[in-house]
């Protein structure tokens, strides 16, 4: 009986399959705007003179906090690695993404980003952070939002990256 259990145990060990595990995340950046106006965008609330009094201190604090949160994502399962890719919403432009990936916690992992300027009048876009050692994008496409109701036909908003 003991030999049968040993044989079954050895067979079970040999039958195990190895899997690669990658972390994938998503984080709404909750209006990650810089302090400069983007021509053609309604980003006036996020200027130093705007309703949010969005200044350099608020902007740099937000960058630092978001970078720390993004770098921590997935480390409970993959310590020192984190997520291979992280979808982002509510980012203003490539400038804020440059500043975000330059933050020490993200720069240490070498994150890059994909960003496509969308039609949202407020200047809110989607982006994808990725670790090029773990993920290589093949194509980039912004799929536009298609209104479902006739009253939504004039509503321009961000699409899907």
Predicted region positions:
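Short, surface-exposed beta-strand/loop micro-motifs that present aromatic residues
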Residues: 158-161
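Short Gly/Pro-enriched turn/cap motifs at secondary-structure boundaries
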Residues: 117-119, 150-155
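N-terminal, active-site-proximal structural segment of metallo-dependent hydrolase catalytic domains
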Residues: 15-110, 114-124
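Metal-dependent phosphoester-hydrolase catalytic domains
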Residues: 15-16, 154-156
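Bacterial Sec-dependent N-terminal signal peptides
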Residues: 1-19
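Flexible, glycine-/basic-rich loop-and-beta segments that form/coincide
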Residues: 137-149
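Conserved beta strand-loop-helix elements of the APE1-like EEP
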Residues: 91-92, 121-139
